[in-house]
Amino acid sequence: MSRRLFTSESVTEGHPDKIADQISDTILDALLREDPTSRVAVETLITTGLVHVAGEVTTKAYAPIAQLVRDKILEIGYDSSKKGFDGASCGVSVSIGSQSPDIAQGVDTAYENRVEGDEDELDRQGAGDQGLMFGYATDETPTLMPLPIHLAHRLSHRLSEVRKNGTIPYLRPDGKTQVTIEYDGDKAVRLDTVVVSSQHASDIDLDSLLAPDIREFVVEPELKALLDDGIKLETEGYRLLVNPTGRFEIGGPMGDAGLTGRKIIIDTYGGMARHGGGAFSGKDPSKVDRSAAYAMRWVAKNVVAAGLASRCEVQVAYAIGKAEPVGLFVETFGTAKVEADKIEQAIATVFDLRPAAIIRDLDLLRPIYSQTAAYGHFGRELPDFTWERTDRVDALRTAVGL
């Protein structure tokens, strides 16, 4: 078998782009909480001392946007100018208009209803935009996620945990992780390299304090957790690089501007699967960029959980204002246990991929999105993450004749 290295990265909740994602989704949640039919497209730009929120919203709800922005920044941990940003004193600028009526007419009354006269209630809502979305699953981890992004997210989450609980009190909110795994064919066999970069206080020695603390309190506990989860991976002699550029005192929005939607590979599968290009945060579920990508994860995960394939990638495509998808494609990378066309037919039979049906089946009109905005939208089996359920396994197996 051919050996290869594959790398994925993650970032902490204090990374500037992730701050922007979390702000956008916090605003979305506030609007959905009061008006579940809210149409929301909110973008956030954050830079030194300033947050700018812009977008289009149609809603009956009221949200104190400036206060929501400040509260989220403080919750993340930026509460002092010494850390490069202070949510209590930063400027907040808001420029929000209403959704274009040209877009609204296609979402409110789909092509099937408007032109073809279809009376099906689920055909009344059209896709909020054209586009293509991918979902992916693989059996290399218990959550059916690729191992490199799975471990990278676990490391970045723990990096924030040890900062917040005081285990490593001199850490600051901004941070990144990166994991390189060696594969033998399609099987993950060895951990090659871990990179951890974390913002820190000014009086810290990297070699005698930061690097040993990161190894002891961040990396090693997560490697043990892999074993506890039944993941067999050779970790002896892996390379650990901690802050390889040197000191990392200036971080967060002072170090780099942040923008909603700039971490779409981190949000999904770490580069292991294809991506249609649409970001998630700040968008209500009428936007298929988000809801259909969640549905495709649901589909792919159920295919793998059903034992129909070891790896599965599913693509769906929509035309703006039309309810039915214009395309569905399934790739199993030679791992299918039944004929590939049977899997595609089973998906079309078992899953209704019209936007209104996705919203109904995954219960997406709830204020659940702020918790998706850091550490990955997929692979975290939280109660609100309905797209992580494997509730269509039996139906898929029946549909293919197993």
From Swiss-Prot:
- Output this protein's name: S-adenosylmethionine synthase
Source organism of the structure: Streptomyces avermitilis (strain ATCC 31267 / DSM 46492 / JCM 5070 / NBRC 14893 / NCIMB 12804 / NRRL 8165 / MA-4680)
Pathway, according to UniProt? Amino-acid biosynthesis; S-adenosyl-L-methionine biosynthesis; S-adenosyl-L-methionine from L-methionine: step 1/1
Name the job this protein performs.
Catalyzes the formation of S-adenosylmethionine (AdoMet) from methionine and ATP. The overall synthetic reaction is composed of two sequential steps, AdoMet formation and the subsequent tripolyphosphate hydrolysis which occurs prior to release of AdoMet from the enzyme.
- Location within or outside the cell: Cytoplasm
Q: Where does L-methionine bind?
A: E56, Q99, D256, K287
Gene giving rise to this polypeptide: metK
Recorded GO cellular component terms are: cytoplasm
Which enzyme class?
transferase
| Keyword Nucleus among UniProt keywords | no
Q: Listed disulfide bonds for this chain?
A: none
Q: Where is this region: Flexible loop?
A: 99-109
| Residues that hold K(+) according to the record | E43
- Binding of Mg(2+), residues: D17
Q: What is its EC number?
A: 2.5.1.6
InterPro entries referenced in this protein's UniProt entry, alphabetically? ADOMET_SYNTHASE_CS, S-AdoMet_synt_C, S-AdoMet_synt_central, S-AdoMet_synt_N, S-AdoMet_synthetase, S-AdoMet_synthetase_sfam
Q: Which Gene3D superfamilies match?
A: 3.30.300.10
Q: Which family does it belong to?
A: Belongs to the AdoMet synthase family.
